A protein has these predicted regions:
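Sec-dependent N-terminal signal peptides
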Residues: 7-16
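Active-site nucleophile loop of the alpha/beta-hydrolase fold
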Residues: 132, 203-211, 228-231
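C-terminal catalytic histidine-bearing segment of alpha/beta-hydrolase fold enzymes
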Residues: 222-226, 242-244, 255-324
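The conserved beta1-alpha1 loop
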Residues: 98-104, 206, 227-228, 296
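Acidic catalytic loop of the alpha/beta-hydrolase fold
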Residues: 230-234, 300-301
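Serine-hydrolase catalytic machinery in alpha/beta-hydrolase-like enzymes
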Residues: 71-87, 91-178, 188-191, 195, ...
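Conserved alpha/beta-hydrolase "acid-adjacent" motif
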Residues: 232-244
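A domain-start/cap signature at the N-terminus of enzymes
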Residues: 20-96, 122, 151, 177-203, ...
């Protein structure tokens, strides 16, 4: 059964209300996925070609190292939270990590539960929590070809302009620009990997690729993904609108020309007797890697050991990125 966009919105809202706690044309295959070798293009909403300089305004500080900023992109006011590590000095370039919230959520929420401020302080990078736009229903989200009410938003162009802003004003390391996100924020991070050469790698926690989206990556990418196989919101094995998670993994392994794959059992930190699995595709071009954590009997959540999970996705995301 093929669901229309309105049905998808209703289903996502229902599932997120029940399940989400955050404890928060080209070749289409039968799976609905895209062959990375096909360069014929296809639909994908607004592109990322506009590099207009942003007029960024400070709204207010949250603390000495964290500030809320606003700007305008297209017809939308955009806001984002910036956290810089202690003793930040723009004379020295450091990495940048975008952190993206899920559908109906906010930058404030993922800033609160992800814990990336503390990791940024320890590892010396800038964390930027970007707020999605709000549709006419008052719902927040991203243009990722899943929820139709965001189709007119040029999110990719906005992130391209943000990257230029941080290069100019913060002197970030151009070779170490990353994005990660929860749920629809994971979808958005994948879209950035598909369209922006500047993105070195992405992390997805319970996100995926949209079935109705063409991904033609401009270069090789480092990919790390966490997903529960009992996720009822963005199912591990896919839906009519989201690609199966292991198919996404295989796509990026193919894109990166990875030659080998291994499977490792995740340590049972919470002693529940369930064995999760880490899939690693390696020996890839340009020293990239593609990693998938299949979390056994886990649902739609940001994984954290303090919440009873076997691992901390935030710590592992940065551990993966730091040497890339």
């Amino acid at each position: 059964m093929i669901l229309n966009r309105k049905s998808i919105i209703i289903i996502l809202l229902c599932f997120i209300f029940i399940n989400c706690s955050n404890k928060d044309s080209t070749t289409i295959h039968p799976t609905g996925f895209v062959d990375p070798s096909d360069s014929s293009g296809g639909s994908g909403g607004s592109g990322g070609g506009d590099t207009t300089q942003l007029d960024v305004q400070l709204m207010y500080p949250l603390d000495d190292q964290t500030k809320l900023f606003s700007t305008t992109w297209g017809a939308h006011q955009r806001t984002f939270i910036v956290h810089v590590p202690p003793n930040f000095d723009s004379n020295y370039s450091i990495p940048l990590l975008f952190v993206l919230h899920g559908y109906t959520s906010s930058a404030t929420a993922i800033h609160s539960y992800s814990g990336f401020d503390q990791i940024a302080d320890q590892e010396n990078f800038i964390a930027v929590y970007v707020q999605g736009t709000t549709d006419l229903n008052g719902t927040t989200g991203w243009n990722v070809n899943v929820v139709g009410t965001f189709d007119d938003v040029d999110d990719v162009g906005f992130f391209k302009a943000l990257i230029q802003y941080f290069k100019t004003d913060y002197n970030i390391n151009s070779d170490k620009i990353f994005s990660c996100g929860m749920s629809l924020g994971g979808f958005m991070s994948y879209r950035l990997a598909c369209e922006l050469e500047e993105i070195n790698g992405i992390g997805s926690v319970t996100g995926s690729h949209a079935v109705y989206y063409t991904c033609n990556p401009p270069n090789k990418k480092n990919i790390i993904h966490f997903h529960g196989n009992a996720d009822a919101v963005v199912p591990y094995y896919g839906t009519s609108w989201s690609v199966p998670v292991e198919t996404v993994h295989d796509f990026w392994a193919n894109n990166n020309n990875c030659q080998d794959q291994s499977q490792i059992t995740v340590p049972d930190f919470n002693n529940d007797g369930l064995q999760s699995t880490q899939f690693i595709s390696y020996n890839c071009d340009e020293n990239t890697d593609v990693v998938l954590y299949k979390m056994e009997y886990e649902g739609h959540t940001w994984f954290h050991q303090d919440w009873g999970d076997d691992l901390n996705s935030s710590e592992l995301i940065w551990e993966f990125f730091k040497d890339k």
